[in-house]
């Protein structure tokens, strides 16, 4: 069994309608993928006192936290996905995408350092973007991307 080093798991976003131009979120400290299914109550009088359910709609969302860099839309830094220097998206670009209501392509998964290069892809909207800057603390932001349509395993 290969236990994944969480440092290798990243969120990548493309805003040009091309899932081939994905960029990792800059200076990320956490990444999370949540999937859920609604259940439809199908209990009948003959269920013997036990609730019965049928599968309903599925949904998913990504969330993450990162340090804030306000120097521009992107920054050149070591990309944990590729293991080499690359262009990473900053909170400034994410703000623009949120404000415009832009649908983005996403990928959640492991890159060059991962054990199996497994990833999940789909389309999403930025549904939440918050920034925090406490006294003598590192400025951070949190982002939630809510999926629209299917999440695919790649």
Model-derived regions, located:
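Hydrophobic residues in beta-strands and at strand termini
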Residues: 108, 145-147
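Hydrophobic lipid-interacting interfaces of membrane-associated proteins
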Residues: 148-152
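Solvent-exposed edge beta-strands and adjacent loop segments
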Residues: 2-70, 119-144
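Short, acidic/charged, Gly/Pro-enriched secondary-structure junctions
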Residues: 76-123
